[in-house]
Amino acid sequence: MAEKNLEQMKEAVAEIREKMAAAAREAGRDPAAVQLCAACKTRTAQTVAASAALPIDVFGENHVQELCANFDAGAYCGKPSHFIGHLQTNKIKKVLGRASLIQSVDSEHLLNAIEKEAAKAGIVQDVLLEVNIGGEESKTGVAPEALWPLLDAAAAQEHIRVKGLMAIPPVNDDDARNRRYLAEVYKLFVQAGERGYPNVFMETLSMGMSGDFENAIREGATLVRIGTAIYGERDYSKKV
């Protein structure tokens, strides 16, 4: 499947929206409470700008270079942009002001570095804390038991506001197992909200991608990150 044209993207987003709404209703939730984040890794500014006319709520970027290029080119057409990839501390400055939400904070070291740069810029940066729910070495994120000290550290910051959690469960074909991982993340999300940390607002639960977004919504996701189902297969030879 090659990269889709505008008409194909339009059809894809309409189908995704229908599936999102059905999954939300199945769980007794308001479909309007779940946002669609278009994961636009490797897409050109022209493709991103074209998709901005579709019912996409927010754009998600994995690479700082692509976030900068698309943001500076106006490709998001006024819609919010989030950073959803692994963030290196030496690139934080470029993300601030371009990403309204950094979804992938996975260490106290990164948290402190964002605090430092946000203080210099005189802003309060919204973030999500990333949880490695499957304990996979190939993925970033904190172990579930390490979430609590990270929340303690985040609550003490003056220029960071925690808005929720992000997770990528292990890829598997077992539907029940997938839902168990997603349910575990939701449980952490609820527990974090109940603990009443200052400066922490459990509003956004970012989980679910092209292969499991319906399950994620059934298990409580408020934002799903979808790339290939919208845009088609990625051509990694084009961009970083």
Where are these regions (language model features)?
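Gly/Pro- and small hydrophobic-enriched strand-loop and loop-to-helix capping segments
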Residues: 221-239
